[in-house]
């Protein structure tokens, strides 16, 4: 069997000892990973790039919209989507399915977290957001929040054009523990800094630039948040990067240099071929 992390491999080995780890990888020559970042305003663009199943993870950030300096920070929620259906079970036993209303989308729940229920943005911006103009990226580029709609899978990584640092909170549970470090890899190849949960795959090989006690490690590749400090450390690190352009750049460069060869699709495919050949030769 093959899997993507040594953490997941240890779980699988409880049932099958023959496990080989091949991490997720990226082809840097793919067009969506080869685009430069859009020019930024005077705000640090803090990205949230995830799917529709992360509400419990993002709820760890409740209150963050009022903890960061909104004059220096912009949250960019990428992947916004209002598609979906709702099933209604009637008293007479009939079952009815209907398209959801835009405001019923889980993405609106995400949005409320990063706007303090729309209190941190201007009335004009809120009016625009409430129109739910699907596919029209948010033109309010200098507000404390920006909405970016879902994109085709072949253009997914272009979201990173509008992100300086990605945040990846994870609620501690068995499912999240065995996830791969894909977000870390995406950030590296797109020259994006990374703030992640000090849990699961992000503990495999990331080196925190801010160590316990506040010591700075110039070789660090990320900022990692302890689960016991979810209530304050996310905002602390975001505000730090908003004030420290040198640290932001160093994190972006260090992570890129760490992933560019280690997680290249060509390199991982080469490892796969060599492994499969070794199996054939044994037989």
Predicted region positions:
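Nucleotide-sugar-dependent
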Residues: 56, 145, 149-159, 164-189, ...
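Glycosyltransferase donor-binding loop in the core domain
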Residues: 50-53, 179, 226, 260
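Short, polar loop motifs at secondary-structure junctions
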Residues: 4-9, 79-83, 198-201
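Donor nucleotide-sugar binding/catalytic pocket of nucleotide-sugar-dependent glycosyltransferases
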Residues: 1-33
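Conserved catalytic-core segment of nucleotide-activated headgroup transferases in glycan assembly
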Residues: 27-33, 38-161
């Amino acid at each position: 069997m093959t899997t993507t992390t040594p953490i997941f491999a240890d779980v699988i080995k409880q049932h099958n000892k023959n496990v080989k780890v091949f991490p997720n990888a990226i082809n840097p020559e793919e067009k969506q990973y080869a685009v430069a970042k859009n020019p930024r305003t005077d705000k640090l663009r803090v990205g949230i790039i995830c799917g529709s199943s992360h509400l419990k993870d993002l709820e760890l950030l409740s209150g963050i919209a009022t903890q960061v300096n909104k004059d220096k920070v912009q949250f960019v929620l990428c992947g916004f989507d209002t598609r979906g259906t709702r099933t209604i079970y009637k008293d007479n036993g009939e079952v009815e399915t209907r398209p959801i209303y835009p405001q019923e989308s889980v993405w609106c729940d995400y949005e409320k977290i990063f706007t303090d229920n729309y209190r941190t943005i201007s009335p004009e911006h809120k009016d625009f957001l409430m129109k739910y103009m699907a596919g029209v990226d948010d033109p309010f580029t200098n507000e404390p929040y920006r909405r970016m709609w879902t994109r085709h899978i072949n253009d997914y990584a272009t979201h990173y054009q509008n992100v300086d640092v990605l945040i990846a909170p994870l609620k501690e549970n068995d499912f999240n523990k065995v996830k791969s470090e894909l977000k870390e890899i995406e950030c590296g190849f797109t020259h994006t800094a990374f703030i992640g949960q000090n849990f699961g795959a992000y503990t495999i090989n990331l080196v925190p630039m801010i160590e316990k006690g506040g010591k700075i490690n110039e070789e660090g590749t990320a900022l990692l948040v302890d689960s016991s400090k979810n209530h304050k450390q996310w905002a602390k690190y975001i505000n730090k990067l908003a004030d420290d352009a040198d640290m932001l750049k160093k994190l972006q460069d260090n992570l890129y240099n760490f992933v560019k060869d280690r997680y290249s699709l060509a390199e991982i495919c080469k490892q796969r071929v060599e492994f499969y050949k070794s199996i054939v030769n044994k037989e």
